[in-house]
């Protein structure tokens, strides 16, 4: 049975008139017009072919060695005195049993003037720079593609809208001027680094205008470095026992972090003080399922060891609320930040959904989630939910009309697209955060 591939992320423009959605290797654009009317505004697909690129690289290497091989062949003779010619190497290509190739699009960000969209592509480990033109039939136009030696994992855009900070899979951080011309071969040196995979990065500044880069990694670390003098480490924030998957920044130097621990950490990143921790263990237990059982090789005899992790934590822009979700669960947890005691967190609300949450984002004071709706019966729905704060009720509520109309817009936009309408077994892996957890084998 074929289904529309679930949405992997959403990003909304400042005024809410433009929404970008990631599905597999595509970015879909929609214009939002009140009341609850959506208009398809174009699609961009990453057509980069990994297999062909591998073949091209191999062909270049073979061509470069051809003259050398010819000289060596002259020296090789059989017993009869005939020259022996070497057989050219076969160009590699995936065969039976080879792991599938997933061309994820990640890390959607808009520049502050919203004239450009920045994203990352797994296909060639690149940073993508798009022009955004709301008057065009297709609002996105790819302008530049900066390729890296390792996969970009997280990005942050500087206030000048031209500098992008990139944190990669191998622990290095780079600074790229998106107005520059991309190099054919990546030669840039990192501006700072960790010894393990980076998971998040933020470029911020203090009240004196001094800039800092905050990075988190798989090794429980949060590092604060001066920018652009990144060789100067300002401080480390220690307290996590497991990996840090997500961080977000608020006013007055507030930093929130989460990951493989069963706690949310609140910090004053300027002083390095851990202000508080919020233990969500008992809150999330009713929402855990078989997907949270530890891998068999790390289980006990009763097969009841569970492992869970926060996939994303994000703050409301104007309201004192922060939301997060645990990977492979059907809820988001909203916390209220104390206005009297900086860093104090208290449960505000738990919102449940019919399917597991895949991503969480925020637009002003609205939270947005995408759902793993591949098991939706009948007409596929529940691709995303838009969650608004109701001042009269002092609570967050799902805007069902807006969400339902968005479902219809998604369905119409992908009709006849054999890439985005796919078999269930061909859906990209949607739960990757739990793989960051380290077990005994990582310490041996």
Swiss-Prot record:
Phosphoserine: residues bearing it: 93
Assembly and binders: Forms a heterodimer with the catalytic subunit TRM8.
Superkingdom of origin: Eukaryota
Alphabetized GO MF terms: enzyme activator activity
Result of changing residue 223 to L: Decreased tRNA methylation
GO CC, one annotated term: nucleus
GO-annotated biological processes: tRNA (guanine-N7)-methylation; tRNA methylation; tRNA modification
HAMAP family: TRM82
More about this protein: Present with 5910 molecules/cell in log phase SD medium.
Organism lineage string: Eukaryota, Fungi, Dikarya, Ascomycota, Saccharomycotina
Subcellular location: Nucleus
Family listed: Belongs to the WD repeat TRM82 family.
Protein name: tRNA (guanine-N(7)-)-methyltransferase non-catalytic subunit TRM82
Entry keyword set: Nucleus, Phosphoprotein, Repeat, tRNA processing, WD repeat
UniProt-annotated stretches for the region Disordered: 55-92
Biased amino acid composition, Basic and acidic residues: 71-85
Chain positions of WD repeats: 1-47, 48-99, 100-147, 148-192, 193-237, 238-279, 308-354
SUPFAM superfamilies: WD40 repeat-like
Record's function text: Required for the formation of N(7)-methylguanine at position 46 (m7G46) in tRNA, a modification required to maintain stability of tRNAs; its absence resulting in tRNA decay. In the complex, it is required to stabilize and induce conformational changes of the catalytic subunit.
Pathway: tRNA modification; N(7)-methylguanine-tRNA biosynthesis
Keyword Repeat part of the UniProt annotation: yes
InterPro entries, sorted: Trm82, WD40/YVTN_repeat-like_dom_sf, WD40_repeat_dom_sf, WD40_rpt
Encoding gene, per UniProt annotation: TRM82
Record bears the keyword Phosphoprotein: yes
């Amino acid at each position: 049975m074929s289904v529309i591939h679930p949405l992997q992320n959403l990003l909304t423009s400042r005024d809410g008139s433009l929404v970008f959605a990631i599905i597999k290797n595509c970015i879909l654009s929609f214009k939002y017009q009140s009341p609850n009317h959506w208009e398809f505004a174009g699609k961009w697909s990453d057509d980069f072919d990994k297999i062909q690129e591998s073949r091209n690289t191999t062909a270049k290497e073979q061509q470069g060695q051809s003259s050398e091989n010819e000289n060596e062949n002259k020296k090789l003779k059989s017993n009869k005195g005939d020259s022996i010619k070497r057989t050219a190497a076969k160009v590699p290509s995936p065969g039976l049993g080879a792991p599938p190739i997933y061309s994820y699009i990640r890390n959607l960000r808009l520049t502050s003037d919203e004239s450009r969209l920045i994203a990352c592509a797994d296909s060639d480990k690149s940073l993508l720079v798009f022009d955004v033109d709301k008057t065009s039939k297709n609002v996105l136009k790819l302008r530049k593609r900066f390729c890296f030696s390792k996969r970009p994992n997280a990005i942050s855009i500087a206030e000048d809208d031209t500098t992008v900070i990139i944190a990669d899979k191998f622990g290095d951080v780079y600074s790229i001027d998106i107005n520059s011309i991309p190099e054919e071969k990546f030669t840039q040196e990192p501006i700072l680094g960790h010894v393990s995979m980076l998971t998040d990065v933020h470029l911020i500044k203090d009240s004196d205008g001094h800039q800092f880069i905050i990075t988190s990694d798989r090794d429980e670390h949060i590092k604060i470095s001066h920018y652009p003098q990144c060789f100067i480490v300002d401080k480390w924030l220690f307290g996590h026992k497991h990996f840090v998957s997500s961080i977000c920044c608020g006013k007055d130097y507030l930093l929130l972090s989460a990951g493989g621990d069963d706690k949310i950490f609140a910090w004053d990143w300027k002083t390095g003080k851990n202000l508080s921790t919020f233990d969500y263990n008992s809150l999330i237990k009713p929402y855990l399922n078989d997907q949270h059982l530890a891998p068999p090789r790390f289980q006990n005899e009763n097969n009841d060891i569970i492992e869970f992790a926060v996939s994303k934590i994000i703050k409301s822009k104007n309201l004192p609320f922060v939301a997060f979700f645990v990977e492979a669960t059907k809820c988001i947890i909203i916390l209220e930040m104390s206005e009297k005691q900086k860093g104090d967190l208290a449960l505000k609300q738990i919102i449940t959904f019919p399917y597991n949450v895949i991503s969480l984002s925020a637009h002003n004071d609205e939270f947005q989630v995408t759902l793993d709706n591949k098991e939706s019966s009948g007409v596929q729905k529940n691709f995303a939910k838009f969650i608004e704060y109701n001042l009269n009720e002092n609570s967050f509520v799902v805007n069902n009309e807006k969400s339902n109309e968005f479902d219809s817009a998604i369905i119409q936009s992908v009709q006849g697209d054999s890439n985005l309408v796919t078999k269930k077994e061909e859906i990209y892996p949607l739960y990757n955060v739990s793989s960051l957890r380290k077990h005994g084998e990582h310490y041996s």
